[in-house]
Amino acid sequence: MEVMSVIPYVIEQTGRGERSYDIYSRLLKDRIIFVGTPVESQMANSIVAQLLLLDSQNPEQEIQMYINCPGGEVYAGLAIYDTMRYIKAPVSTICVGMAMSMGSVLLMAGDKGKRMALPNSRIMIHQGSAGFRGNTPDLEVQAKEVLKLRDTLVDIYHKHTDLPQEKLLRDMERDYFMSPEEALKYGLIDQVIDQTRENRGGEE
């Protein structure tokens, strides 16, 4: 049985009456982008468009990107990554739940000092998948492209973590899972957010 996703709507009072927003459009008004699905072309186009819109509105004001992403297509993820690095507006990234594979690339693409994770989130790196399909004659061409993409991802992780490329290659041979604290030591994030209700001074 297929489960239908339900997108909540928010109703706001304006000078012209009531206005209805889907929850993601309402968050976008506050310069919040939510990455909560696997990375693929249509989703990447939407995220890129949101980044470009917010940058055009105010290139000085921070954009917050919340990430709960199981990973996905490398090409689509790199489109988002390059846009995050291209725009002038600073981007903070917050992992809620998980940032796996290309999700971890987006997490570490935030501005230095603004890459965060909630205490029970999980981060995972690996070589990634190009999603190739084809006939036997294409295998050699595809294999070369897979190696090219692997080298590209290693270069990106190296740029943001300063870890030796040899270590990154070893770690990325298999799924490499990390807690937020381990991701902090690894250099993927800058801060583990521990400001939950329990340690905000006993707020009810």
UniProtKB/Swiss-Prot annotation:
Disulfide bonds: none annotated. InterPro entries: ClpP, ClpP/crotonase-like_dom_sf, ClpP/TepA. Its main location: cytoplasm. One of its GO terms (cellular component) is cytoplasm. It catalyses: Hydrolysis of proteins to small peptides in the presence of ATP and magnesium. alpha-casein is the usual test substrate. In the absence of ATP, only oligopeptides shorter than five residues are hydrolyzed (such as succinyl-Leu-Tyr-|-NHMec, and Leu-Tyr-Leu-|-Tyr-Trp, in which cleavage of the -Tyr-|-Leu- and -Tyr-|-Trp bonds also occurs). Keywords: Cytoplasm, Hydrolase, Protease, Serine protease. Fourteen ClpP subunits assemble into 2 heptameric rings which stack back to back to give a disk-like structure with a central cavity, resembling the structure of eukaryotic proteasomes. This is ATP-dependent Clp protease proteolytic subunit. It comes from Deinococcus radiodurans (strain ATCC 13939 / DSM 20539 / JCM 16871 / CCUG 27074 / LMG 4051 / NBRC 15346 / NCIMB 9279 / VKM B-1422 / R1).
